[in-house]
Regions:
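Amphipathic alpha-helical coiled-coil/rod segments that serve as protein-protein coupling scaffolds
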Residues: 2-129, 142-146, 152-160
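Short conserved beta-strand and strand-loop elements enriched in small hydrophobics
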Residues: 164-168
Length: 168
């Protein structure tokens, strides 16, 4: 898994056929939901701070044009606005990271196939540094088999099935 936590749901059984994107496991989502809500609140706060900084900058521009405030005050207001803009970008990036982490709590099948062994059960603590994977999904849609036959065996199979293609 890409996140750490306790397995809260095991949605498949060993040997079960699964489709690409099917849910296999759910890792405890509570801390990741809280982190996302915090990140969303931080984005809203950063948007408000940016709006306030923009109002202050616009006001300082007008006052500077009338020689009421110094160029230093204007530059300070502009720097505050740029800082608030950067803070908003940072908070949006943190929100995206929190959203991704929450999505990683749902472990889905990467392909169609069959579920292998399930070494971890509900309640097990899992993390990205585990030595064993949560499970493996074996894609068995294309299988190639190599074997050897004597000419007599091939001839016998060809006679039995009517053609070499059907025999193999």
């Amino acid at each position: 898994p890409q996140v750490s936590g306790f397995i809260t749901q095991l949605c498949v059984e060993e040997g079960q056929a699964v489709r690409k994107g099917q849910l296999l496991f759910v890792i405890d989502q509570v801390p990741y939901q809280a982190a996302l809500q915090t990140a969303q609140a931080n984005v809203e706060a950063a948007e408000a701070a940016l709006s306030t900084a923009k109002l202050t900058l616009d006001s300082k521009k007008e006052l500077h044009a009338q020689n009421v405030v110094s160029a230093f005050d204007l530059q300070t207001a502009e720097n505050s606005w740029l800082s608030a803009k950067a803070q908003l970008a940072q908070m949006k990036a943190l929100e995206l990271n929190a959203r991704n982490n929450l999505s990683y709590t749902e472990v889905k099948s990467p392909s169609n196939g069959v579920v292998g062994t399930l070494p971890y059960r509900v309640g097990a603590l899992v993390s990205a540094s585990l030595p064993k994977p949560l499970t493996t999904v074996s894609d068995n849609s294309d299988m190639y088999v190599y074997f050897s036959l004597t000419e007599n065996q091939l001839l016998g199979l060809t006679r039995q099935y009517g053609s070499k293609q059907k025999a193999l």
